[in-house]
Amino acid sequence: MRALRALPALLAAAALALCGCYSFSQTVLPSHLKTVSIAPAKNLTYQAAMGDKLTQGLPEMFRKEAPSLRQVNSQGQAEFEITLKSYTNTPHSYNSSGTVDEYSVAIVVDVEFRDNVKEETIYKGTGLRGSGIYSMSKGESEELHGQTRALEEIQQLIVNNALSGW
């Protein structure tokens, strides 16, 4: 009887132990995909350089998460297209005197990751959101602090979502 009571706890412990074991590896990726190209992001916002910043951070994240997938400038066996849909910088919190203490930068994108060999979509995401908060009270007076955090968050989300589709 005691053994039956302990079974759920043992199963839960085993599940928790295995949570950190999954990673993307060459055996997880489809064998027919060896190269990926990342097109420059289409930028529909008033932030002229934001599309370039978004695109530039993705190759390094891919190298970390999917090292067997080689990146090429064009005509990859897999292809990424990203559209930067919106960019906002809004007050996030106020201090006791009523002035803004923190701002939140938010970036919203649409993503399509295609398999050009099989001519099918691997992953499509619409309205993916990354945000970054920067604090005036911590001396972060420039929007760039929030942009950097928002870009890192959205880039990681894009890569994780695309690779989890495999």
Task: Enumerate the language-model features and the residues they cover.
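Compositionally biased, intrinsically disordered linkers/stalks adjacent to structured regions
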Residues: 143-166
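Mobile beta-alpha loop/short-helix "lid" or hinge segments that flank ligand
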Residues: 26-31, 124-134
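Positively charged n-region of N-terminal signal peptides that target proteins for export
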Residues: 1-5
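Surface-exposed short loop/turn segments
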Residues: 65-69, 75, 79-122, 130-147
